[in-house]
Swiss-Prot record:
EC class (word): transferase
Organism from which the protein derives: Candida albicans (strain SC5314 / ATCC MYA-2876) (Yeast)
Record-linked InterPro entries: Kinase-like_dom_sf, MAP_kinase, MAP_kinase_CS, Prot_kinase_dom, Protein_kinase_ATP_BS, Ser/Thr_kinase_AS
Function text: Proline-directed serine/threonine-protein kinase involved in a signal transduction pathway that is activated by changes in the osmolarity of the extracellular environment. Controls osmotic regulation of transcription of target genes. Regulates stress-induced production and accumulation of glycerol and D-arabitol. HOG1 is also involved in virulence, morphogenesis and oxidative stress response especially through its role in chlamydospore formation, an oxygen-dependent morphogenetic program.
Lineage: Eukaryota, Fungi, Dikarya, Ascomycota, Saccharomycotina
Catalytic residues in the record: D144
GO biological process entries: cellular response to cadmium ion; cellular response to heat; cellular response to nitrosative stress; cellular response to osmotic stress; cellular response to oxidative stress; cellular response to pH; cellular response to stress; chlamydospore formation
Modified residues (Phosphotyrosine): Y176
Protein's UniProt name: Mitogen-activated protein kinase HOG1
This protein's UniProt keywords: Activator, ATP-binding, Cytoplasm, Kinase, Nucleotide-binding, Nucleus, Phosphoprotein, Serine/threonine-protein kinase, Transcription, Transcription regulation, Transferase
Primary location group: cytoplasm
Single GO cellular component term: cytoplasm
Ranges of Polar residues composition bias in the record: 359-377
Length: 377
């Protein structure tokens, strides 16, 4: 590791990690499509943290916008069951680093290690629902809920992470977004006109996986994915088929043999280790018609959640998220300036809070200098 002014550099998995001297003892913990995550020790607080490197965020306007969106969301969404932003900085190589509290594991790793006992399945489902209630109240859809995006610490506290694909509530949304196993059928059928209900479908898939210890709908491709969904739910109802806009998709659905649904009580009859209420909630989550699917607010009042449900401790977001930037088609340099400005604002806000608490925040002047440079000052 070599020092470079305020930053230190090290090679991890062949990738340069260039972070401020505030963070030491880097160890890789995960690699994703958009970045590398390392654990580290925050010398300012003594806490263990996760440092996520977003690789080449300014290489294209699409990547720059995606990173800007994730930053804005992390700054806006503040809830016990959502990952929070502790620090953010841009390195001299212009990579962006997000810093969060380090969680012990994620649900994907937990499910691969051992079967979950029923009380953990119930508690994790409750916390996911509680977080989604807050997210949806802000006018945000996560769009990529899956076990690897659900972080869990040693106290079984759960936090939803990875808002890179999150979008606003918009009846005309399009795109091929969530990981296939957890993807709602309306995304596969229409690729548009979907809403917060797509997240509840994902919760259903996750709940089923916690119950059985394996993915419920392990599709090899989206055709196979849809086919195995119909094996459980039966053929989609006519009003769902009527929403299909693509002629090719419509022909595909109409070509499938008619299937009758399998009752959930029959399909999950062997799952005697969980309460019948869990299977009832599952049946209300995994519904073809999104308008008939249970919402996060409704899910929290379901009998399966009774042990944890507390209407006085299930907050909503104080304000809707501002999506005004989302349709902007801007050059990379503009996104860069906007990003620096957001980072500076974050450090100034944190700095005021830390001054109140008697600690210091060292990075705001660095970011001000970077912003001046980005603006050509």
């Amino acid at each position: 590791m070599s020092a470079d002014g305020e930053f230190t550099r090290t090679q991890i998995f062949g990738t340069v990690f260039e972070i401020t001297n505030r963070y030491t003892e880097l160890n890789p913990v995960g690699m994703g499509a958009f970045g590398l995550v390392c654990s580290a020790v925050d010398r300012l607080t003594g806490q263990n943290v996760a440092v996520k490197k977003v690789m080449k965020p300014f290489s294209t306007s699409v990547l720059a916008k995606r990173t800007y969106r994730e930053l804005k969301l992390l700054k806006h969404l503040k809830h016990e069951n959502l990952i929070t932003l502790d620090d953010i900085f841009i390195s001299p190589l212009e990579d962006i680093y997000f810093v969060n509290e380090l969680q012990g594991t994620d649900l994907h790793r937990l499910l691969n290690s051992r079967p979950l006992e029923k009380q953990f399945i119930q508690y994790f489902t409750y916390q996911i629902m509680r977080g989604l209630k807050y997210i949806h109240s802000a006018g945000v859809i996560h769009r990529d809920l899956k076990p690897s995006n659900i972080l869990i610490n040693e106290n079984c506290d759960l936090k939803i992470c990875d808002f890179g694909l999150a979008r606003l509530q918009d009846p005309q949304m399009t795109g091929y977004v969530s990981t296939r196993y957890y993807r709602a059928p309306e995304i596969m059928l229409t690729w548009q006109k979907y809403d917060t209900e797509v997240d509840l479908w994902s919760v259903g898939c996750i709940l089923a996986e916690m119950i059985e210890g394996k993915p419920l709908f392990p599709g090899k491709d989206h055709v196979h994915q849809f086919s195995i969904i119909t094996e459980l739910l039966g053929s989609p109802p006519a009003d769902v088929i009527d929403t299909i806009c693509s002629e090719n998709t419509l022909r595909f659905v109409q070509s499938l043999p008619h299937r009758d649904p399998i009752p959930f009580s029959e399909r999950f009859a062997s799952c005697t280790h969980v309460e019948p209420e869990a299977i009832d909630l599952l049946a209300k989550l995994l519904v073809f018609d999104p308008k008939k699917r249970i919402s996060a607010v409704e899910g929290l009042t379901h009998p399966y959640m009774e042990a944890y449900h507390d209407p006085t401790d299930e907050p909503v977001c104080e304000s809707k998220f501002d999506w005004s930037f989302n349709d902007a088609d801007l050059p990379v340099d503009t996104w860069r300036v906007m990003m620096y400005s957001e980072i500076l604002d974050f450090h100034q806000t944190v700095g005021v809070a830390n001054e109140t608490e008697g600690s210091e925040q060292p990075d705001s002047q660095v970011e001000q200098n970077n912003l001046d440079s980005a603006n050509g000052a």
